[in-house]
Amino acid sequence: MCKTNRSGKSAVLTQEQLELFLGQLPEKYSVLAEVMYFTAGRVKEICTLKVRSINFQDGLLTIEKASTKTKETRQVPLPRTVLEHLRSWIHSKELGPDDYIFYTDSKNTSYRPGEKAISTQSVDQFFRKTFDWIGVTGASTHSFRRTRLTYLHLVEKWSLAEIMDISGHKNLL
């Protein structure tokens, strides 16, 4: 697997790598990866999202302080396409407001859908295997965050203050 020594920084993905990666994933992981990318969220922040975290009308996702590294709640806008993918996923699984959007569905557990959040380790392992499968080295769950923030800064010309706000960074050191 890539990055076995866990040193260095996660790779920043090209648009082609991102599209190739998303095309290899089953629905749950594809929607999860889209949310990770467009929110520039950390894997734990996204794995612990509940249905009530999404304001479909305003197009906002609330990342609760309990799951953030900085212990501060933040709101992040989501594109309509991602909101529709989330709506479809939630509806197809019949999830309620207090259910986890991305949940464990192991055959070895007795949890009902939405009852227990998917583990960050499960997502990390699945994503690393997929990156290896498509030949992308040095990538991990954190690559979505780095890729999005890099894109917003270099392509969309966001200021560092805006980058810090969406990412939940308190400083850039």
Segments and roles (model prediction):
Residues 18, 29-30, 120, 124, ...:
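Short, leucine-enriched amphipathic alpha-helices that occur as contiguous helical runs
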Residues 1-18, 69-80, 95-99:
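DNA breakage-rejoining catalytic core of tyrosine-based enzymes
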Residues 137-155:
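Short basic/aromatic active-site micro-motif
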Residues 39, 48-82:
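Conserved tyrosine-mediated DNA breakage-rejoining catalytic core shared by Y-recombinases
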Residues 68-88, 99-128:
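C-terminal catalytic core of Y-nucleophile DNA break-rejoin enzymes
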Residues 53-56, 157-173:
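Short, polar N-cap/turn motifs at the start of nucleic acid-interacting alpha helices
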Residues 2, 11-43:
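Basic, Lys/Arg- and aromatic-enriched nucleic-acid-binding interface segment
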